[in-house]
């Protein structure tokens, strides 16, 4: 049972193994010791990707299971930077940045009621940055880390029935909305002894899960959302 989404989860004995083909083109530059700049273009093809999907249930609670899609294609660009900050007078400090932009599209089996969407669990962008302090002479280490991911599908919706027969039922995709996360850590060595302190998710922002559904109101198309 998933308490965050208030839904039951069941297995699927008919699942097929997923296969991934990956191609990437990467440029890397190392300006000095401990520094790196890299840019990568990548493409991934998924065959039979496994997704967490809403399935029909006779009960009142939603039920999710793991289902194979026909395929999926992901492509994008990734940038990775590691830089010492001595050049601006911040000795023993360094900075890192990792960011990615990803375009994702799922391929569906013929005859289904699905519409174009990204692969479940895939965010359109990822951002990770960090500020680090390292002083080996005095035994100090510290870091501030920031993370953010774009809106992503965590539960694939489904469509059942036929509009012409009056039994159509639409279960929208469930999305995890973007949130900011900051982690702090510091450590100090005393000979062979090390003391370390860590604070995770300093901002403690709420997790929001939303469903969006297109409806017609007074002859105009609108999108309504439900928040959990």
Give names to the regions the model predicted:
Residues 58-65, 107-118, 156-173, 214-225:
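Flexible, solvent-exposed loop segments that connect beta-strands
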Residues 1-8, 49-57, 102, 106-115, ...:
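Outer-membrane beta-barrel translocator domains and adjoining extracellular loop/strand segments
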Residues 19, 29-33, 45, 83-89, ...:
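Outer-membrane beta-barrel strand-turn architecture
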Residues 26-28, 40, 80-84, 130-134, ...:
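Transmembrane beta-barrel domains of outer membrane proteins
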Residues 47-48, 136, 148-164, 187-228:
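C-terminal beta-signal and adjacent terminal beta-strands/loops
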Residues 42-46, 63-156:
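Gram-negative outer-membrane beta-barrel transporters
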